[in-house]
């Protein structure tokens, strides 16, 4: 299983990369806005510069989302983003216009991430259109009393049935159990906020054991 970090914060990306477990990065307009703050406008050029800065930190794929809602606009923005670095993956929503853009990008050898996926039928269409990745949002489904992990199970089963090469990125991850369940189901990737990466590392018995070992080690003369 691959781990992506779901953030636009450069410090968090660097910290995750230093752990040696980071395979890629996903961003979206909300994460970019969080980094930009409200002090000044975040221009399109500033957005592209920020994606370029992320690409300098990581070796793996970096997903950057288009903001246009029509296929032509998505294609124009996506081509600009793809020109930044060969690692850039264009995130497009699974809409009628988004599927057109995904199909275009597939025909032109530009990687795509079909995002805002909440049903197996959306994931099936994304794979048929040629998406490189598909991102079902498990946490947001859980928020509306729907089993997000069941969606992952359905998508993985469908893709295996028909040998689709589209990879499943489990997105909107809220806690470490989401990651464990995704791994057990067989999802290709989990994209994880930095706080959840820290949750994956932490266990109270590890901390208690380390405390005891440290106390006992104090009697050893070096």
Swiss-Prot record:
Gene3D superfamilies: Aldolase class I (3.20.20.70). GO terms for cellular component: cytoplasm. It holds the Pfam family TAL_FSA. GO terms for molecular function: aldehyde-lyase activity; transaldolase activity. GO terms for biological process: carbohydrate metabolic process; pentose-phosphate shunt. It is found in: Cytoplasm. Belongs to the transaldolase family. Type 3B subfamily. Transaldolase is important for the balance of metabolites in the pentose-phosphate pathway. This is Probable transaldolase. The gene is tal.
